[in-house]
Amino acid sequence: MDYEALKDQWSDVEERDGIRLSWNTFPSTRMEASRLVVPIAAVYTPLKEKPESPLLQYEPVTCKAPCRAVLNPYANVDVRARIWICPFCLMRNPLPPHYKDITENAIPPELHPQSTTIEYQLARPAPAPPIFVYVVDTCQEEDSLKALKDTLILSLSLLPPNALVGLITFGTMAQVHELGYTECAKSYVFRGSKDYAAKQVQEMLGLLAPGPRPNVPQQPARPPVGPAARFLLPVQQAEFQITNVLEQLQRDPWPVANDKRPLRCTGVALSVAVGLLETSFQNAGGRVMVFTSGPATEGPGHVVGPELKEPIRSHHDIDRDNIKYYKKAVKFYDALAKRAANNGHVVDIFAGCLDQVGLLEMKNLSNFTGGHMLLTDSFTSSQFKQSFVRVFDKDANDNLLMGFNASLEVLTTKELKVTGLIGHAVSLNKKSSSVGETECGIGNTCAWKMCGIDPASSYGVYFEIANQGGPAAVQPGPQRGMMQFLTYYQHSSGHYHLRVTTVARPLSGPTGDPALAQSFDQEAAAVLMARIAVYKADVDDGPDVIRWVDRMLIRLCSRFADYRKDDPTSFRLEKNFTLYPQFMFHLRRSQFLQVFNNSPDETAFYRHVLNHEDVGDSLVMIQPTLDSYSLEHEGSQPVLLDSASIQPTHILLLDTFFHILIFHGETIAEWRKAGYQDQEGYENLKALLEQPKEDARELIADRFPLPRFIVCDAGGSQARFLLSKLNPSTTHTTGGYGGGVTSQTIFTDDVSLQTFMDHLMK
């Protein structure tokens, strides 16, 4: 089968099952697996939208404990004897009575060969409607606060009518607004400088009265009773009150001297929000949405002092350990993040500020709970407004696309063991026969809790081969290894859903089976390795991680490339390996591993987004796409990410996922400034200038977070965004800049790979 046909097959599987594997044939022994260099792993998108597949309105048929695998197309079903054999543990299970009418030709949907991914609506209702707590920073300029209030008021109309909404505002103090009190505006005030224990918060808010007990089913239609109902009201009942309170929000009245930062107690506000949901709504889906316009400067979790002369920490300070607030703040926010994750609640962080706000310290609030993280210059920007509205996207039945309180469990057949997950989740510490001995990412468990999950949420799941090898280990006949992914989540319609994906792949034959190399998916592998590199970069030194990336690439090439010793020119890679070295070249230059020129907050944001997206979008972040437009060609043409692609008569469109940039070559820019496009007879120039804008609009259409849109000319200051991504060819400097300026510092792709190959031969 040629590579193109294989690629089509893999993308069909991705469409159907939301999964891409690094190797589509599994090695049969652990020894063989270790020689593959890239681990056996999957990028899995559990909630990938599948509008055409049916939602099954009954409970799934499961295997006996401890296996609990769900009936799937790979199970052997004996129609006459009414039994099925589980492919994971080989146990025989009776089919339930309502399956009595099945025949060879009439089988239930979950046994259809195409039903490798299927979704069940479970009978178990959600304990409460979805909850949204807005936590709003009032230490900001009037125009920015007004823009934020308008966006929040607009968002009320996007929530399900039964959703519960709460409001906490913070500046020097944190205030919990009692929305249920209609006579006048009433709020509970917490001192910004004090670290409140969870119990204190709950006592002060009067929440320790007997609330709805967990594990006792409640009718989903009734709004919850209990003390928290004063602070959290159903939108349909209280939209007017909430709108009123939001409209009347004022800037924080505390005076701020010119040489000081405003006192901002982000930590206290977050701790109160988590405490509010913890008592009455444990394991009910909820989101704490924080809107901050500056760093926390007071109380627990502050990241910088109030004096402006003291700058907020940079990467350089962190490297030199010159960080007096960092460790304490991280410890505080991590403890909060763990509490929120255990309760099943999501924390989203929206920053509207030109300076850093302390995302680096707060990042695990979103990373542990599956929350969103958004970094914008101001709440007045369209980037913030449009991205925020996109959080509330709905499906065809007008249900929110976000799932709440989710968990993912992975089962494997005896050949495979799961070693861990890299993505936005925490471990559920569940042990089973599927758990491996080694650890990659969040390991030593076969189940993880996500809290927040949406149709784009993707997870890297890593595996190892259990089989030690030896003559008895290889059985005759074709073998296959299997994995099953079970995703439970609270759907916004008020029911729990279960999405089941079952994957089977052949096991390789005896050592040296060529099927292994042919089954390598270089795109999925690059993304899975990038996730490991970023995971390492959070704990290890930057240069060490880049050395690790290089080492892994050298080992992969020495294993799979054809070359004659001491003859670099003889180096050849198979078609499905050729792009992998350049993905790695761009990964090591990317903002995920090179922190130079980015603030620690930006680095935390970029890494957060990489760990959320699927293979296609992650690849755009690692190796941006570049398209060229000119009068000679109709439409756009993909060109190399290289300074040789800059031509005076071409327009370039660069997509880095976070930025979309239109770059006008020198001549085109001069024509445009001279106004030729508005003159008669130059319609083709006008069309040429419009075309990239149209294409950029399409790229932006369904992307979250909304990318920054930049239009620039050759030689303009904004052109730096393009130049920093290009591979500077040293062979020909383009028009005297671009290549010429940077070619001394960064070697070209070819040279680096060439040196690389020379080292390899040695």
Swiss-Prot record:
Highest taxon, organism lineage: Eukaryota
Location of this chain's protein in the cell: Cytoplasm; Cytoplasmic vesicle, COPII-coated vesicle membrane; Endoplasmic reticulum membrane; Golgi apparatus membrane
GO cellular component, one term: endoplasmic reticulum membrane
Record SUPFAM superfamilies: beta-sandwich domain of Sec23/24, C-terminal, gelsolin-like domain of Sec23/24, Helical domain of Sec23/24, vWA-like, Zn-finger domain of Sec23/24
Gene Ontology terms for molecular function: GTPase activator activity; zinc ion binding
KW Nucleus (keyword) present: no
Topology within the bilayer: Peripheral membrane protein
CDD domains listed in its UniProt record: Sec23-like, Sec23_C
Keyword Transmembrane carried by entry: no
Annotated positions binding Zn(2+): 63, 67, 86, 89
Sorted UniProt keywords: Cytoplasm, Cytoplasmic vesicle, Endoplasmic reticulum, ER-Golgi transport, Golgi apparatus, Membrane, Metal-binding, Protein transport, Transport, Zinc
Pfam families to which the protein is assigned, alphabetical: Gelsolin, Sec23_BS, Sec23_helical, Sec23_trunk, zf-Sec23_Sec24
Record GO biological process: COPII-coated vesicle cargo loading; intracellular protein transport
Signal peptide annotation: none
Protein's job: Component of the coat protein complex II (COPII) which promotes the formation of transport vesicles from the endoplasmic reticulum (ER). The coat has two main functions, the physical deformation of the endoplasmic reticulum membrane into vesicles and the selection of cargo molecules.
Record text on subunit structure and interactions: The COPII coat is composed of at least 5 proteins: the sec23/24 complex, the sec13/31 complex, and the protein sar1.
Family label: Belongs to the SEC23/SEC24 family. SEC23 subfamily.
Protein name, as recorded: Protein transport protein sec23
Organism: Aspergillus clavatus (strain ATCC 1007 / CBS 513.65 / DSM 816 / NCTC 3887 / NRRL 1 / QM 1276 / 107)
